[in-house]
């Protein structure tokens, strides 16, 4: 019986890992491939005009948007949920949108978040995600992919 229980735990972990990998797959249909997150504006204004300036833009975008923003937000979200402070999650949503300077990036984040919510709720029963969707619909929060992913 112990062997069967061990196999069950291993399969459960494998299934959870497969689910995470699916959600993180670049081909997952959340629409993020449709958004340049402000890069088109930089191209139009000749801020990005060669491989070097593009590389610099990617480096800055990753360091300032994804690592120090989205990654930190997810960590803060986990801490808030561990402490039972769901209201803190909604504050984090507002902070993420407020600190996103480029309008294109803010709009893209909202669109990707709404698509993520729809697909995730089609696949999983996540009560906090349902609450988040209602708050977005009632314009209490904006909607951000980092919050969706964290929830």
What are the language-model segments listed below?
Residues 71-72, 76, 85-151:
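Internal, conserved structured core segments that host functional sites
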Residues 11-18:
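Membrane-interface "cap" regions at the ends of multi-pass membrane proteins
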